[in-house]
Amino acid sequence: MKLENKYIIGCHCMFYEIDMVEEYLNSLRLAMEEIENTENIKIEMMWNMSEYFEQCEAKQSIYSKIEKLERKYNFDSLFYEDDDKPYTMADYRRELNNQCNECDYVIWGESDCLMPRQLFGILEQLMEYSKSNNINRFITTFGIRKMWDESWKVLEHPKFTDKPYYSMDTPEDTKLAESSPWSIRYTMSQEEMDEVNSETKELDVQMIKYPKFDGSGLVISSDLLRTGANIPPAVYMNGDDSAFLDSCRLHMGENYRQYVIKNVLKVHNRNHPNKRNYVKGEDQSKNTHFKRSTRGWYKEFNEVSKGNLNKLYYSQEPFNKKEIQK
């Protein structure tokens, strides 16, 4: 297949995610297998090696692993190595969005995300349809697994939407959450995702006129970003997707458009067992889901960021500019 559009797919990867990120890169490689003009796709990796918040136990080994990935996969590497100033995924995604003038689509990659093989074929069709119908500013999302409340049903894959949701509040629920393929806490493989997607013979494409998405694998038309929609600087880390969602709503109003590819699954492995390795002093016996939440800096940073998120629009409340200490 020859692409008519240009793509940039950017991913921020912390040093402790290095043992997980190849699965994401491999999913992109598989999605590109049938593409004739791969020069139309720019894959960018921002390797965050900063020890501002957490110390790394094996930094040189991680650099070596990055070099191996660079030899195996075709992507551009950027590095953040300042130990005296924090840099987060929200910072990177703001910068990624600003590359909108160089492409037709900006895609938010994520180190624990698997993108579907059908990615480019679907997006090419959508752009053709959109242009013929004068829809130039839009978001595209793929099907997701069972989420925690009814508001997400519009995005859930039909194979999973009627399944039960398991929290991780009790040992029993944690066990079910980690062992049920439809659960967002279950670590799904490329092969399992491919099997689900192989069942789709005809696309179920729905359009919603209000923003609803998580940031993993988010597809944004460059014209939407040219409106100025972005992640506000007041949101430092947590809530970057929610802040961007509100920005899209503010910029587009009643003209907001989002394609939902219901029956093509993308995977967000939030609870991947290799999500947090090489962090000095971290209790490796803990479940991935609970590791970061026990860190004091994380709790503080989370409160600052989410507190600002609630003040973004239609408010005169001052933002919290507090510097988070190491």
Language model regions located:
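Active-site-proximal specificity loops/subdomain of glycosyltransferases
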Residues: Y52-C103
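Active-site acidic Asp-centered loop
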Residues: N48-S50, G109-D112, G143
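Hydrophobic targeting segments
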Residues: N5-H12, L28, K42-W47
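Short, flexible/disordered intra-domain loops and linkers
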Residues: D19, E51-S61, F120-G121, S151-L155, ...
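Short beta-strand-to-loop acidic/aromatic patch adjacent to the donor-nucleotide binding site
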Residues: C103-P116
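Short, well-formed alpha-helical segments that are part of the catalytic scaffolds
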Residues: E17-E34, Q55-S61
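Conserved catalytic core of nucleotide-sugar-dependent glycosyltransferases
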Residues: N97, P116-R226
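C-terminal catalytic/acceptor-binding lobe
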Residues: E195-K326
